[in-house]
């Protein structure tokens, strides 16, 4: 009899644990995965922050993973999120080509994929959210033209590109050249990549200055590289306009301090929030657009 009571007691405890476990499962929030190319860049930190605020508001658990600019780590991150059972994947690709196979990992599990800021050149993408990078490049060029409208030239220009192969690199450069190449007084003396990295931007700019210090304009495909370029320019004592792209806080502070000249300001927090908003709509069976544009503006002193 005493043994039967013990068996009954253990059985009751197991039933309570199982009920508790099932209850916890019901209370769990649906998970959205977010894979960012790097969190060593204020732009993507702001994107993460915007997504987290929107996820909290809408009742989702946002799982954010950092690819550290490594396509192999990016794929591993997505594989982990697939195993976790996310209801949607927000991804900012390290590279538009390299990410294709990674997108297909999510596709095989029927997980909707939303790309942020940079496009994927393949795989099934449910929606893409970004600033109009071509338009942003054109805005940078129009700003330069306005600044030099009364000068005959030649005006020497340096372009510091982002990661080769990234859609943002391609589109920002295309937009810039759409305008600049129509005006003969501008002379591109150097076009080099610095991978959206501040330290590489500094090193690239130092090398360019050593080869030819006669520079009037620098257009960098993001603020991190522009800030690196500014450091090299200050050290060399030359006077040049430096235009970045993103509108991060460090760039705005540099502009306010009369170091950088301007930046094409994005709204990364909005891009992140829109990603979660679209994931929520997909989860609830609502239709969405395949492309969403976030507004840009020129920030200058």
Task: State what each model feature region is.
Residues 160-168, 179-180, 267-301:
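Hinge/cleft segment of the Venus flytrap/periplasmic-binding protein
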Residues 32, 74, 129-155, 200-202, ...:
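Hydrophobic alpha-helical segments within soluble ligand-binding/sensing domains
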Residues 1-31, 61, 104-111, 287:
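Short, low-complexity disordered leader/linker segments with a strong preference
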Residues 33-54, 58, 62-76, 80, ...:
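Extracytoplasmic "Venus flytrap"
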Residues 88-107, 176, 194-252:
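Hydrophobic alpha-helical
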Residues 88, 96-135, 154-156, 248-261:
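Flexible loop/hinge segments that line or gate small-molecule binding clefts
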Residues 43-60, 136-143, 167-186, 200, ...:
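Short, solvent-exposed amphipathic alpha-helices that sit
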